Amino acid sequence: MSKETFQRNKPHINIGTIGHVDHGKTTLTAAITRTLSGDGLADFRDYSSIDNTPEEKARGITINASHVEYETANRHYAHVDCPGHADYVKNMITGAAQMDGAILVVSATDGAMPQTKEHILLARQVGVPYIVVFLNKIDMISEEDAELVDLVEMELAELLEEKGYKGCPIIRGSALKALEGDAAYIEKVRELMQAVDDNIPTPEREIDKPFLMPIEDVFSISGRGTVVTGRIERGIVKVSDKVQLVGLRDTKETIVTGVEMFRKELPEGRAGENVGLLLRGIGKNDVERGMVVCLPNSVKPHTRFKCAVYVLQKEEGGRHKPFFTGYRPQFFFRTTDVTGVVTLPEGVEMVMPGDNVEFEVQLISPVALEEGMRFAIREGGRTIGAGTISKIIA
């Protein structure tokens, strides 16, 4: 049987289930595939096949995460579900699966629990833009307790709004009942997917964003000038476009006089392509790896930011000992390592391996940074943590 080609006839969205342990994230994931498989839009995946998750590496950190694919009438979804709380923290912080939106699963019998709150906070810090809530285990609530569910909903809406998620749709249902084939609860899963279709917008494609390419290498070609190479992160660059070189030194403006790929001249380079750009009036010593070349004024150099960080455990190849304010590791952004000084928040004495923490960083050189950007923290050539910029200070 020949391998099917990937049909790109629907917009693609990345989503994931988040929420407290045992509130039904994996059962819901299975119930979604069961429900949509009935419409010929998914292959049914049972609980054990999702729960038996492959390991993946993101920035040197092992994450157990299961990826499930399915479609609704309008879209193609890639859905990530993690078994353990630590895996969610790592997955969200490293951006192993960048989520365009999340389904927050909350048990109606428990309401919001510590990990519910932590996952909402993490979602905000790492820039998950939209959340749809599935209030699970509704079948366990007796009629006389029905108004408790209204209280749980109000509390959830408040909690979400506090973290900047206003007006999230809340769908009540039972993942287990839907999985067992109960028609009324299957309808609830359909309602959930309709809410996901309607409330999680299709993200802007990388190609439509302002041009940016992290520089990996610099060459000079005699008689022609300086060429910078790299993979275009977003946008499009054309011959004779004005661009800026940002980071590590003073920002410079120049003009692209040539775009090359595999030694062939092109009229333009697009997001995802590895290209060489010939730059007018730039000497080989004016530019270095780690700078970015971008649409003028679309990104600025910064040195101070707040970040959400996951610190690797010893068993994951991380540090064996805690660190304190004043710690000076290397921060790895795109194609460059820059030393930075850590300042822990008030009341936090030290950070232990395995911690999930927020702190401030002061870099010794400016780098082109943006909120929501991911980075690795290294020490002596090994990764000891991963983070996301939650706020730029200077």
Curated annotation (Swiss-Prot):
Residues 10-204 form the tr-type G domain. GTP binds at residues 19-26, 81-85, 136-139. It is an enzyme of class 3 (hydrolase). Residues 81-84 are annotated as: G3. GO terms for cellular component: cytosol. GO terms for molecular function: GTP binding; GTPase activity; translation elongation factor activity. PANTHER family: ELONGATION FACTOR TU, MITOCHONDRIAL (PTHR43721:SF22), ELONGATION FACTOR TU-RELATED (PTHR43721). NCBIfam families: EF-Tu, PRK00049.1, PRK12735.1, PRK12736.1, small_GTP. This is Elongation factor Tu. It comes from Chlamydia trachomatis serovar L2 (strain ATCC VR-902B / DSM 19102 / 434/Bu). The lineage of its organism: Bacteria, Pseudomonadati, Chlamydiota, Chlamydiia, Chlamydiales.
